[in-house]
Amino acid sequence: MSAPKKTYSSTTSAKSKHSVRVAQTTADAALEAVYEMSGDSGDSFDYSKSVGQSAESVPAGAVTAYLQRMQRGGLIQTFGCMVAVEEPNFCVIAYSENASEFLDLMPQAVPSMGEMDVLGIGTDIRTLFTPSSGAALEKAAATQDISLLNPITVHCRRSGKPLYAIAHRIDIGIVIDFEAVKMNDVSVSAAGALQSHKLAAKAITRLQALPGGDIGLLCDTVVEEVRELTGYDRVMAYKFHEDEHGEVVAEIRRMDLEPYLGLHYPATDIPQASRFLFMKNRVRVIADCCASPVKLIQDPDIKQPVSLAGSTLRAPHGCHAQYMGNMGSIASLVMAVIINDNEEDSRGAIQRGRKLWGLVVCHHTSPRTVPFPLRSACEFLMQVFGMQLNMEVELAAQLREKHILRTQTLLCDMLLRDAPIGIVSQTPNIMDLVKCDGAALYYGKRFWLLGTTPTENQIKDIAEWLLEYHKDSTGLSTDSLADANYPGAHLLGDAVCGMAAAKITAKDFLFWFRSHTAKEVKWGGAKHDPAEKDDGRKMHPRSSFKAFLEVVKRRSLPWEDVEMDAIHSLQLILRGSFQDIDDSDTKTMIHARLNDLKLHGMDELSVVANEMVRLIETATAPILAVDSTGMINGWNAKIAHVTGLPVSEAMGRSLVKDLVLDESVVVVERLLYLASQGEEEQNVEIKLKTFGTQTEKEAVILIVNACSSRDVSDSVVGVCFVGQDVTGQKMFMDKFTRIQGDYKTIVKNPHPLIPPIFGGDEYGYCFEWNPAMEALTGWKHDEVVGKLLVGEIFGMEMMCCRLKSQDSMTKFMISLNNAMDGTNTDKFSFSFCNREGKFVEALLSTNKRTNADGVITGVFCFLQIASSELQQALTVQRATEKVAIAKLKELAYIRQEIKNPLCGITFTRQLLEDTDLSDDQKQFLDTSAVCEQQLQKVLNDMDLESIEDGYLELDTAEFEMGTVMDAVISQGMTTSREKGLQIIRETPREISTMRLFGDQIRLQQVLSDFLINAIRFTPSSEGWVKIKVVPTRKRLGGNVHVMHLEFRVSHPGGGLPDELVLEMYDRAKGMTQEGLGLNMCRKLVRLMNGDVQYVRENAQCYFVVYVELPMAQRDDAASQM
């Protein structure tokens, strides 16, 4: 046997991928050189043969020259003209030969010298257009990313001819491509991407409405939508595989055209240089491949040809134009599809980047162009497609890993009964672990073969070859045994090309085998008739397919990372477990150990299941579940509280027929159907009916996530809904909308009740940036207004507020477009970097902006965030998390035991309410009722982190301040009487009837806690504790008023211990129970836009609580915005 030269593994590490791309670039350069030589010599260019020979070495200089020609060819297409200018003076440094004619500078008759416009090196391009057009070019050049304003509509100075100016920056200035505006073009009234993106709104809506889990359907849909948008004869989705070759995975075409669906193409068909250009300029249009290109004239002082990498007019290479002509395609439009790419670097760390997944390719049998705004809309559609595709790719990977894990579990279970023979002799077996054509176990000099494999002697020979030439390795994976230099590869034929081998003992192996790639190819078009004599030497899709088959005839599909991980995991389980086939003691020990692990795992599963049930029952989020027939079989305490329907009455009722409002029936039925198919919807709004004490509310509004419930056989047996109660917020927003006054006065008000708000006009320019946004971002109103929301303010690079990822920007753009189309987006995750470089985590809601006639004129954006102080305190609070968890079980028991007698108290009170009572007795019962509600709310506070982090959803409802004061004082009466103290109540008369909007129960909770702490630390001899309320009415603007309330709880004596006060302010090292209560109350007050102070004076101490709440009554009728 000869020593191996090199092993080609199917690994997809970053280093390996880079090596493959470098090698492919060399092959591209070699193929191009052969093509150029054939043209010079007059010989014919044999494409199929040249592809096979392109792997030969090429000088580095030749590769560099090839890459330069691809980007700096000096030729453009005829459907426009190009001018390159210097910054900032706009002096011309290069232009196309057709520019003077295209810009209407060629005289129709002999003009006077004063009327002549001349285009030449050094000309100020602005002088060739109208003054407003020149100003538009200047404005675009002043932006950081000039391409965001494309297309810029300009008019020639002499003729008034309208043109699209499409600009981008290069190393020496600005390149401007000019295209004609045709009368039948879709109207775009202003510069900028947002206007163009509206053209793709319907297509984007359809893509987003597709069910998940079907990449084929997603690809089919996108080609249909692109064809409807552009009108090309053929539209294809073209996917790049791991080995860089391509495949048509979706196609829609004119019926008389030959189908290409299913065809595979060699990697050289789309050169690496072209792929690089697609990453930079994501839309490529060729109007007429038969047209003669136009040359560029440039300043002789420029050292190298002007870069056309980003130009929309860059002429096609002669090789590509010939390919198009041979296939009968005269015009094309190609769009890049880019997704996330997670690669491991040399240290094993994950590097998150972007990669070219493939292309969407449009062909037309006659010359054709689509206007730039429509091309821009298609580019945005590709961003959305890429984002959807990325989710599908990740989901498919997760499902594949899940399948592998399930198979591994079954194989491990087989080891308990018959190791290691069970993994090849039973079902499932090792062939089910990864995709393969055959597998084998070589163990103790015996063979177990499955599927298509080499013979026993050949497997023995492979094992000996591995032991001799790869003795230091635990295995080998390759897509070509021939390229891995296995001497007997030629004897295996096409049936066995690829192999993955795993060493399980010093001399024993597991093998997986794959046949050649051509076997896997699914030919979707008409199969080639051997009687038809195609000229394989011509460049054509069929000859490309022939070349592809030639390239891969000795190769299998590559082994994916996830497959190799699965093989390696099984190898680790087996290696060392069976050193000798007769070592029965070892086998017995392993069996016992695996059985113990299995039993231990079952115990842990039981514990986890019980804990999950407890968490669901006690969760502060409303949770309900139904069985496969739609009947309620889960109804936790929170949803029982918000709906007023007890658990006992909810169980067994129909969700759709009995509990859902009519307007939500269709939505819920769709959720149930999709979940029964395993498709889990998220963030869906549903409305439930109310019962009992909650009937005063029209409905309970929940934002729910649906989760499919499965049995041990993975069958869907029900659906669980985890919700967020947004009823109070919706009611408050509705009422606040009705009572809001002058818009400017409210939005511009620095009051803490006003959230961060920004807005964009119909062209995407920022017109609003309120004080709260200034404080949040660090960017002032005057610094951002007039800039583009996407690209200049929010973007990926040197923008005011840098976003986390490209997907984040795409989602932001989708939400803006949806709002402009009349569809609001509610609370999606939105993270950006502020001026100080700190990331802000927020929830973004977008709403349409309309004028008096109801016409949409822009978009309003609202952010919800936690306060900066709470964010800073987050780290400190999380340090106590472990201690809190330890106490959680104890608290859960106490909470549960309190609920039963509380239900008895509530029942007794309800009985008394039905009797004849005096006014005083009715007031006593009202006070008792709100105290019960406060106790119930405290019992449901299982997740203190939501309070600590500032994300707790406060209830918002109308309430009477007098009821709050009665409840607060009643809670302090027992303790005060025991200590012989008198509670003095000092409140203005209007407090008893004052009606406000807010969370009544939380307000009385914090006030009662401060009052009881004051009583607790007042000496009995002093004799009193006083609570005083000072209301101050404030006008926000227009007719909107808030009530500023100052509560002062004062008491004589030395006051609270210093340590307890420090705990309230998060400044203590530890936390007592009393301190935790005060700390939570202070955070609740801050959630109400207030604060708490504890003041010590000579004779007394006091809590001062400041709160501001909207008033529920106004002096006059509300005016509309």
From Swiss-Prot:
Q: Which SUPFAM superfamilies match?
A: ATPase domain of HSP90 chaperone/DNA topoisomerase II/histidine kinase, GAF domain-like, PYP-like sensor domain (PAS domain)
The entry's comment on post-translational modification says:
Contains one covalently linked phytochromobilin chromophore.
Q: Which GO terms describe its molecular function?
A: phosphorelay sensor kinase activity; photoreceptor activity; protein homodimerization activity
User: Could you tell me which residue ranges the PAS domain spans?
Assistant: 608-679, 742-813
Q: Which cysteines are joined by disulfide bonds?
A: none
Enumerate the Pfam families for this protein. Answer: GAF, HATPase_c, HisKA, PAS, PAS_2, PHY
Q: Where is the GAF domain?
A: 214-393
Repeat keyword on record: yes
Please give the function described in this protein's UniProt entry.
Answer: Regulatory photoreceptor which exists in two forms that are reversibly interconvertible by light: the Pr form that absorbs maximally in the red region of the spectrum and the Pfr form that absorbs maximally in the far-red region. Photoconversion of Pr to Pfr induces an array of morphogenic responses, whereas reconversion of Pfr to Pr cancels the induction of those responses. Pfr controls the expression of a number of nuclear genes including those encoding the small subunit of ribulose-bisphosphate carboxylase, chlorophyll A/B binding protein, protochlorophyllide reductase, rRNA, etc.
UniProt name for this protein: Phytochrome 2
Organism the protein comes from: Ceratodon purpureus
The gene from which this protein is expressed is PHY2
